[in-house]
């Protein structure tokens, strides 16, 4: 069993002292982290944070992404929320932004998508599996193809690449360093 210790921060204020866990303190500065697998729990947390911050004011919100990817539907829920709020969303790739992590990195407000100089990005075709009767397998296969087309169109729009190039590049794992990710259009700048 891995025990994760979350640091706390003590701040002095007019009432004395306020204790925050590190993530809550950073949230005060409009900073959100997506780390690890993107799943329904991650999506609920990130969506709640985005909506909360947007309800306070419409200043920029920063999302740091270090994720191997995960659920397409959970990722699209985060994406849709990023698009409906009034605040600009700055995305910053740290470590590895792969699969849905790369998609979310590319989905920040244009001009406000960054990557650290030693971070990496990986895009690929969505993964899925099916079991059951032939009809059920066909339904799942059709759904996977539909989601692939949807994600590839969105990634093409985000990166200003052609759909043909995205379709070709996502057939296999396609890794990019920071410079390549910037040239590809996933991000706009490298933070050094």
Model-found features: residue ranges?
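Terminal-region recognition feature
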Residues: 1-192
């Amino acid at each position: 069993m891995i025990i994760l210790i979350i640091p706390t921060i003590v701040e002095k204020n007019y009432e004395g002292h306020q204790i925050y866990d590190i993530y809550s303190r950073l949230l005060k500065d409009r900073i959100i982290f997506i780390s690890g697998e993107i799943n329904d729990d991650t999506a609920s947390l990130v969506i709640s944070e985005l909506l909360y911050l947007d309800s306070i004011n419409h200043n920029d919100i920063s999302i740091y992404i270090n994720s191997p990817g995960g659920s397409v539907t959970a990722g699209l829920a985060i994406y849709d929320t990023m698009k409906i709020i009034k605040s600009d969303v700055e995305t910053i790739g740290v470590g590895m932004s792969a699969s849905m992590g790369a998609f979310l990195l590319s989905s920040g407000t244009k001009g406000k998508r960054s990557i650290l100089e030693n971070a990496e990005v990986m895009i690929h075709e969505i993964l899925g599996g099916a079991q059951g009767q032939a009809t059920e397998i066909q339904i799942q296969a059709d759904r996977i193809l539909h989601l692939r087309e949807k994600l590839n169109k969105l990634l093409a729009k985000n990166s200003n690449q052609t759909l043909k190039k995205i379709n070709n590049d996502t057939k296999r794992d396609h890794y990019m360093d920071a410079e390549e990710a910037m040239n590809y259009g996933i991000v706009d700048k490298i933070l050094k």
